[in-house]
Amino acid sequence: MAAKGNREKIKLVSTAETGHFYTTTKNKRNMPEKMEIKKFDPVVRKHVVYKEAKIK
């Protein structure tokens, strides 16, 4: 069985307040700060900034 890695699941939530989100993983050791990335929001059909949120 493989050892547990140090990657943590995160949710990227749209700043356009549409409720749309992506899920991904990130390495906490290499990127301790909150992630912000520009991705496509299909609800508003534009590229918007997505901010990191914890998965409940």
UniProtKB/Swiss-Prot annotation:
Any single Gene Ontology cellular-component annotation: cytosolic large ribosomal subunit
Keywords noted in UniProt: Ribonucleoprotein, Ribosomal protein
Superkingdom: Bacteria
Alphabetized Gene3D superfamilies for the sequence: Ribosomal protein L33
Pfam families: Ribosomal_L33 (PF00471)
Ribosomal protein keyword on record: yes
Keyword 4Fe-4S: no
Gene Ontology MF terms: structural constituent of ribosome
InterPro entries: Ribosomal_bL33 (IPR001705), Ribosomal_bL33_CS (IPR018264), Ribosomal_bL33_sf (IPR038584), Ribosomal_zn-bd (IPR011332)
Any GO BP: translation
Database matches in PANTHER family: 54S RIBOSOMAL PROTEIN L39, MITOCHONDRIAL (PTHR15238), LARGE RIBOSOMAL SUBUNIT PROTEIN BL33M (PTHR15238:SF1)
Entry's family note: Belongs to the bacterial ribosomal protein bL33 family.
Annotated protein name in UniProt: Large ribosomal subunit protein bL33
Lineage: Bacteria, Pseudomonadati, Pseudomonadota, Gammaproteobacteria, Pasteurellales
